[in-house]
Amino acid sequence: MIDGHTKLAGVMGWPVEHSRSPLMHNHWCRVNGVNGAYVPLPTHPHGFDQALRGLAAAGFQGVNVTIPHKEAAMLACDELTPTAKRAGAVNTICFVAGRIIGDCTDGTGFCDNLSAHDVAIAGRAMVLGAGGAARAVAAALLDRGCEVVIANRTLERAEALVEALGGGEAVAWYEWPSLLSGCSLLVNATSMGMGGKAGLDWDAALREAAPGLCVTDIVYTPRETPLLLAAQARGLRTVDGLGMLVHQARAGFRAWFGVDPQADRTTFDLLAASLRTDA
């Protein structure tokens, strides 16, 4: 029951109806005995800054921001964590003593998901894409000592990302399949595969993959994307994107509600059931 002591948080996006974050955070509030609520906050881009400051004034603990607000959120924040600065985007905001503090938990969530599956974060990683998610993932991998190769359909964007990160290597899109023989990790950080649309002949792209390659996708709708299915058919290890969603959310929940939630089977089962309902 919501009362005068309920701590409030939410997710700002446009659209935001698809977000599983309210389901997950409210589940964590229930199982941890937290007097809190997490709500969807559909926010038009033209009103983002005003809405963000209004939520801070209304007593919210903080918010997540999703498409298309992650970069706009950087400009609206009074302070950015070093991780957010490096990632070039914000997905988690805390309202502290009248200040808006932005963080990016995508990279940490991605790596925590790999670790939860006992995947070693080492060696050479091929990252597909040069957008906000790719930057967060690439930064986290570089900071953990990986060699990172970034492939993007527009080479200039990959080159700009490498320059911004101060590390890694940019390659043309057509080159990346031939480089997989020397990689231990392949990350799809693009929207290809969302909704089950392949967007690419993944089986052909994986022909040069080393037997020990781990293939992971940030897309989680569906959980088994065309890339992951193609990798499984070749006997490669795969990690789906749902765990990244769960692990990146934990830092925000900790900051807003003061409890460290568990990325347990119940949480995953709840989210998986929701995804099946919408399929």
Curated annotation (Swiss-Prot):
What are its GO biological-process terms?
Answer: amino acid biosynthetic process; aromatic amino acid family biosynthetic process; chorismate biosynthetic process; shikimate metabolic process
Q: Which GO terms describe its cellular component?
A: cytosol
CDD domains tied to this protein: NAD_bind_Shikimate_DH
Q: What is this protein called?
A: Shikimate dehydrogenase (NADP(+))
Q: InterPro entries of this UniProt entry?
A: Aminoacid_DH-like_N_sf, NAD(P)-bd_dom_sf, SDH_C, Shikimate_DH, Shikimate_DH-bd_N, Shikimate_DH_fam, Shikm_DH/Glu-tRNA_Rdtase
Q: What is annotated about its quaternary structure and interactions?
A: Homodimer.
What EC number(s) would the UniProt record show?
1.1.1.25
Top EC class for this record: oxidoreductase
Query: What is catalysed by this protein?
Result: shikimate + NADP(+) = 3-dehydroshikimate + NADPH + H(+)
Kindly state which keywords UniProt assigns to this record, in alphabetical order: Amino-acid biosynthesis, Aromatic amino acid biosynthesis, NADP, Oxidoreductase
Q: Where does shikimate bind?
A: S19, R20, S21, T66, N91, D106, Y220
- Which residues catalyse the reaction? K70
Which pathway?
A: Metabolic intermediate biosynthesis; chorismate biosynthesis; chorismate from D-erythrose 4-phosphate and phosphoenolpyruvate: step 4/7
- Please tell me where NADP(+) binds in this chain: G129, A130, G131, G132, A133, N152, R153, T154, L155, E156, R157, I218, G241
